[in-house]
């Protein structure tokens, strides 16, 4: 068993984004490019919880990790993760003593 990399041909950047987003899953995406502009556009347009550019590493302890769509619930890791375990309550007291 090992990692698999599907290789698909495409004619335009828009086609890549459309094909990548056309599914019910959204855990993470991987982008290989030499263009910072392409990397930024892909990161903005891909419907995933995280995007790795030119690396296979997408999760680190300091960053939130989790998917969107049918890939998981909420975020793990980072400061955002604690919000899933909190129940915020507001209490206003008009006590005169």
Regions found by a protein language model. Name each.
Residues 1-97:
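Conserved C-terminal structural/oligomerization subdomain of aldehyde/semialdehyde dehydrogenase
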